[in-house]
């Protein structure tokens, strides 16, 4: 057994190369140094490439999303402008329709009033004519009723002569 340097009851520094496995450790470190960079380097390079491509793809999707957002904002703005224009056009059209409706209503009222006035005039003329006719008929009836009493033969002769004379003068 090799002596332990600076040993004190169970703990110390062992300088025996074979007992401490320094050679085994050196072989493992040399193997790792020789073979690990190629193997681990390929894995790390592949991982780095994957991460870079994922980042690039994410940036492209971000750019597309920003373009889509910008396009959507433009479309929304355009749609709002069209909606405002349509709303204003509808207001103007509604006002024009309202004014036209009022105008037609006033014209219709004037036509109805004119029709009523002409109907009233026609009815008044008809009633007046009817009253004149009835008055004339009553006057003729009274005259016919009174005529035999007042008309004697002498008056009849004078009346006939006067009528013949009037016919001859015409």
Curated annotation (Swiss-Prot):
Keywords recorded for this protein, A-Z: ATP synthesis, CF(0), Hydrogen ion transport, Ion transport, Membrane, Thylakoid, Transmembrane, Transmembrane helix, Transport
Highest taxon above the source species: Bacteria
Annotated localization: Cellular thylakoid membrane
One GO term describing the cellular component: plasma membrane-derived thylakoid membrane
Topological relation to the membrane, as annotated: Single-pass membrane protein
Protein name: ATP synthase subunit b
Gene3D superfamilies membership: F1F0 ATP synthase subunit B, membrane domain
Broad class of where this protein is predominantly found: membrane
Record InterPro entries: ATP_synth_B-like_membr_sf, ATP_synth_b/b'su_bac/chlpt, ATP_synth_F0_bsu_bac
Subunit structure: F-type ATPases have 2 components, F(1) - the catalytic core - and F(0) - the membrane proton channel. F(1) has five subunits: alpha(3), beta(3), gamma(1), delta(1), epsilon(1). F(0) has four main subunits: a(1), b(1), b'(1) and c(10-14). The alpha and beta chains form an alternating ring which encloses part of the gamma chain. F(1) is attached to F(0) by a central stalk formed by the gamma and epsilon chains, while a peripheral stalk is formed by the delta, b and b' chains.
């Amino acid at each position: 057994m090799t002596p332990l340097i600076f040993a004190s009851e169970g703990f110390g520094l062992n300088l025996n190369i074979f007992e401490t496995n320094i050679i085994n450790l050196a072989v493992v470190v040399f193997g790792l140094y020789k073979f690990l960079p190629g193997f681990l380097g390929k894995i790390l390079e592949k991982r780095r490439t994957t991460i870079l491509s994922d980042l690039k793809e994410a940036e492209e999707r971000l750019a597309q999303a920003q373009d889509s957002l910008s396009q959507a904002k433009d479309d929304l703005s355009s749609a709002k402008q069209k909606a405002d224009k349509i709303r204003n056009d509808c207001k103007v059209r509604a006002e024009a329709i309202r004014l036209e409706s009022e105008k037609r209503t006033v014209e219709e009222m004037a036509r109805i009033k004119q029709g009523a006035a002409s109907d009233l005039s026609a009815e008044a003329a008809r009633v007046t004519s009817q009253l004149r006719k009835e008055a004339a008929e009553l006057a003729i009836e009274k005259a016919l009723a009174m005529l035999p009493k007042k008309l004697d033969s002498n008056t009849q002769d004078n009346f006939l002569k006067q009528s013949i004379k009037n016919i001859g003068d015409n």
